[in-house]
Amino acid sequence: MDVRFYPPPAQPAAAPAAPCLGPSPCLDPYYCNKFDGENMYMSMTEPSQDYVPASQSYPGPSLESEDFNIPPITPPSLPDHSLVHLNEVESGYHSLCHPMNHNGLLPFHPQTMDLPEITVSNMLGQDGALLSNSISVMQEIGNAEGAQYSSHPQMAAMRPRGQPTDIRQQASMMQPGQLTTINQSQLSAQLGLNMGGTNVAHNSPSPPGSKSATPSPSSSVHEDECEDASKINGGEKRPASDMGKKPKTPKKKKKKDPNEPQKPVSAYALFFRDTQAAIKGQNPNATFGEVSKIVASMWDGLGEEQKQVYKKKTEAAKKEYLKQLAAYRASLVSKSYTDPVDVKTSQPPQLVNSKPSVFHGPSQAHSALYLSSHYHQQPGMTPQLTAMHPSLPRNIAPKPNNQMPVTVSIANMAVSPPPPLQISPPLHQHLSMQQHQSLAMQQPLGSQLPMQVQTALHSPTMQQGFTLQPDYQTIINPTSTAAQVVTQAMEYVRSGCRNPPPQPVDWSTDYCSSGGMQRDKALYLT
């Protein structure tokens, strides 16, 4: 980038003399760059842009009409070599109107231009080298090595760039748009704090990005809280894990079968049995341990011939035991084969006896189809019983709407079930007798709800071409109350015919059980 410097023109007499800040040479303001108000920091001008003298007008607020009350920052208590750094810290930039330094920014004269207030947040948003260098300069004021680092830019770049905690807190508390002016008292207070607290940072051999080995109080407190919480959680989890473990059930010893042969004992055990009674008789107060010691000494004192007698007894007992064991195992195997056969043969009678239904085979499908179609046509009846629960017998039907509880007693039923779709004449005659009895018992009950004893409800036409018409035969019990169980018997009887219907050869048993095909109107045969 080409930077052109123009010779200083004649300064008008009306221009006020710019006071010098610090011992730095006070050069002419025309060599300084213009300040860009939008960017809030100094920037290099374009190569094609000419420098405008102070006598010419340029857009922006008038400088001559405004008064700038910038107090001179020259603390007398500080040494001379630190004044240069104070100017840099106050303005956020390095020495005024010098040639380009290592920061890459042209210095400027603060009193000849519209200089907005410098904010810490804007300093944080600028180049990292500018911020780190300015803060490191503040840290070096109380140290004797500060002059050496500031005189050499390469050493200043190698200098640690740790930020003090008070500067970080101040930068985090500032809002981006808040403007703060650094005066002498604030600067001296910050410098005093830095002089007392930041000397250790220069002697630490750790690199710039390394963390200190000693944790801060806040972090140590947080770690302690985390440890306590982990201990509490661990203490809570341990009982849960203990509770989750099932208590070990002691292994139950297998009960020995009394039929199982017992193992033979050794020769010494046989000798022990023989001599134990004699020793107990001589020493009744002797314990089992003392008796066993005496028996062991006697066994050692026996000769080989006496020992062989006991050994022969044990060998004979072993042979007998093996024979008995083989026979016992063979009996167990034979029982394991015969038990499942007995179970299988005993199951079919139970299945047959568990279904005491009147009709069998296709007639059950007829009853289910008839109930579903009938109650679909008449919504007054309760449709909950149309599913025909398996536990209910097939001869039970739901009660009509809001009638008195009735009980059905069907006597003299045939024990053996009739063939499908066939009703024996004695049964039909018995049902007709029950119908007449129910009509006779209904006459005195005129004040109660009317009850229809015989309901002609027709089912859809079957495959044979005739219609099944059921008769509801009910016998009213005068002593029945509302708490009694309500049952009704539904029997299928062909209207006008006592003979059983012929069963064709092409009858399909799956026809009626394929689903409840429902009709809107009942079909009648004329």
UniProtKB/Swiss-Prot annotation:
Coiled coil: none
MF term (GO), any: chromatin DNA binding
Database matches in InterPro entries: HMG_box_dom (IPR009071), HMG_box_dom_sf (IPR036910), TOX_HMG-box_domain (IPR051365)
Pfam families the UniProt entry points to: HMG_box
Consequences of knocking out this gene: Mutant mice lack lymph nodes. The development of Peyer's patches is compromised, detectable only in some mutants. Peyer's patches are much smaller in size less abundant when compared to wild-type littermates. T cell lymphopenia is a hallmark phenotype of TOX-deficient mice.
Induction profile: Transiently up-regulated during key developmental transition of immune cell subsets, likely marking a developmental checkpoint. Up-regulated during beta and positive selection of developing thymocytes, upon activation of pre-T cell receptor or T cell receptor in a calcineurin-dependent manner. Low expression is detected in precursor bone marrow NK cells, then is up-regulated in immature and mature bone marrow NK cells and later down-regulated in splenic mature NK cells. (Microbial infection) Up-regulated in LCMV-specific CD8-positive T cells. Expressed at high levels in exhausted T cells during chronic infection.
Name of protein: Thymocyte selection-associated high mobility group box protein TOX
Lineage: Eukaryota, Metazoa, Chordata, Craniata, Vertebrata
Record gene name: Tox
